[in-house]
Amino acid sequence: MSKFNRMHLIVLDSVGIGAAPDANNFVNAGVPDGASDTLGHISKTVGLNVPNMAKLGLGNIPREQPLKTVPAESNPTGYATKLEEVSLGKDTMTGHWEIMGLNITEPFDTFWNGFPEEILTQIEEFSGRKVIRESNRPYSGTAVIDDFGPRQMETGELIIYTSADPVLQIAAHEDIIPVEELYRICEFARSITLERPALLGRIIARPYVGEPGNFTRTSNRRDLAISPFAPTVLDKLNEAGIDTYSVGKISDIFNGEGINHDMGHNKSNNHGVDNLIKAMTSEDFKHGFSFTNLVDFDALYGHRRNPQGYRDCLHEFDERLPEIIAAMKEDDLLMITADHGNDPTYAGTDHTREYIPFLAYSPSFKCSGLIPVGHFADISATIADNFGVEKAMIGESFLDKLV
């Protein structure tokens, strides 16, 4: 019998808690990540008021300098620690795959200066359409269609862009480039980005509609991912017949592997919380695991180096946390963590190599406090231990610490 009948893991995308020991091996605009500290710098520069996460023990997590505006709790209601990444990467897929038990020794390729001409030329030859070279760089998905949508409507050229993650995205106005044609082009792009020097995690079709100045992305997005290179704990749970619920982009990150209930993409963090609560309160979800990604911290504020917006986004999530807790059953476990850092006060616009926070809460807890500092994959090892399945490649369970 499982110690916790249901386990819920929420990834606050990019909410790091201080530079990892190997942070200086990773850079942002030529600056090593060694001084990065997402939560620390937000707390120090613009203030952070997250009483519900603080109550669980966020301010108790060991740090050289305590979080300036998140007080430590003398009697927290949950368990807290920080976790270190061992994989060679600081992107979304690497972080999530390691959380689910894999050790990524060869990171995916990212393209901060845009994709090489060879890739663009191959896509042009396959599609019969030109590629807009000026969009070929890391770009906001809404800004790129605002900037180049009018030109695409006139010329039929492809808008190709990337991000901090190992992705190639193609935006196309549905009235100019039909969705099925866009999908075919993306499938070709997927076929030529499966190995180095362009090993990409995902190809994303980004259809949109509207007129210049009023473009809107549609729900016809399609992600062409690659599956994890080895079974994750999600696969182990699925094979054992245990329910696994995906909220947000989790299913895309794992290419659907090990997911048997997908709640769909989130329109926003708040929509993601709504979807999580919908799953938690479903009569069908009696036993199993839910896995949620809330990406707004990263996509809207981290890469754009907006500490005020990032802080407000954290406040917004913290205000919803009591609703999530209210949806829990007595023998549920809630876990809150991250997948990497993205310090909005730091150099550059890329992710930062950081520890991630880990908070755990159950209505059944008799005790609380700190658990030892560990590694990302300890989360999945703990999940596997709870449900009686094998862990994946790496990770050590701390299930016995949660009492």
Swiss-Prot record:
Its EC number is 5.4.2.7. Mn(2+) 1 binds at residues 13, 339-340. Pathway: Carbohydrate degradation; 2-deoxy-D-ribose 1-phosphate degradation; D-glyceraldehyde 3-phosphate and acetaldehyde from 2-deoxy-alpha-D-ribose 1-phosphate: step 1/2. Its main location: cytoplasm. It catalyses: 2-deoxy-alpha-D-ribose 1-phosphate = 2-deoxy-D-ribose 5-phosphate; alpha-D-ribose 1-phosphate = D-ribose 5-phosphate. It is found in: Cytoplasm. One of its GO terms (biological process) is 2-deoxyribose 1-phosphate catabolic process. One of its GO terms (molecular function) is manganese ion binding. Isomerase that catalyzes the conversion of deoxy-ribose 1-phosphate (dRib-1-P) and ribose 1-phosphate (Rib-1-P) to deoxy-ribose 5-phosphate (dRib-5-P) and ribose 5-phosphate (Rib-5-P), respectively. This is Phosphopentomutase. It comes from Streptococcus thermophilus (strain ATCC BAA-491 / LMD-9). The gene is deoB.
